[in-house]
Amino acid sequence: MDDVGHGRTLLSGHSSLNCVARLMAVALDVAETREPLSPDRAWWLRVPAVLLGPRSVFFALREDDPDDVAARSEPLLLIVWMAGAAAVLATPTAGALLDKPEYDAPLVAVWAFVAGGLYGAVGYLLFGFALFFGTRLLGSLGDFRRERQVVGFALTPLALSLLVLFPVRLALYGADTFRDGGPDEGTGEAALLALQLGFVVWSLALLAIGVRVVHGWTWLRTSAAVAAGIALLAAILGVFLLI
């Protein structure tokens, strides 16, 4: 009986997520019916929607209208910057900033803002190029812009981790978050790292969904394209490490 109840709970949770995604899609359709949404507003609404109903968001990337394409730039800028900040704040470098006498809390914030932007921009272009290579290898006729935008919206879970995990880390460890050693090492830190990796896996799943939807491919072809892109990225990083 316990197994049956547990199964029903899982099914109920899955159904709830599906209902939320459908309600968001219906709300967007109703809003468009009552009053046509501007491209800018529509793409801002798609930022949270990609977490629950990614297929409709990635399908919208097929649109080549100049106004629609331009409307994606600001949401993508925010996503890429937040994802970059989440990435740099999880590095060992960030974990030892306050060990340096020249750093204080305001300077750490400035460092996270600047380094996050640079890290995000480089990663966005590099991952976008790798995906462009992978999809071209599998016969895509799409351009670099569309591939990097697929990457950008796939980074939304990683950007979300900045709002979810980093405040938890600060609440648990305070300034020790930016010091080497101390209470921010051990089981708690391992749990936070596992959660961070969970957000990374979520982003990879969205990337695969995005490639499949944008190109209309099978899962096998999609997986091959993503794998080819990751292989190229690994090769590029390997060359940099050897230099």
Which functions belong to the PLM regions below?
Residues 20-86, 90:
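N-terminal juxtamembrane cytosolic/stromal segments of multi-pass membrane proteins
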Residues 96-100, 127-141:
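Membrane-helix interface/capping segments
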Residues 1-7:
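Alpha-helix boundary/capping motif
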Residues 84-99, 237-240:
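Juxtamembrane "helix exit" motif at the C-terminal ends of alpha-helical transmembrane segments
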Residues 41-44, 114-122, 191-201:
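Hydrophobic alpha-helical transmembrane segments of multi-pass membrane proteins
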Residues 94-112, 174-185:
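Membrane-interface interhelical loops and short amphipathic "cap" helices
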Residues 131-133, 140-243:
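Hydrophobic alpha-helical transmembrane segments and adjacent short intramembrane/lumenal linkers
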Residues 76, 80-84, 88, 116-125, ...:
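Alpha-helical transmembrane spans of integral membrane proteins, capturing the lipid-embedded, hydrophobic core
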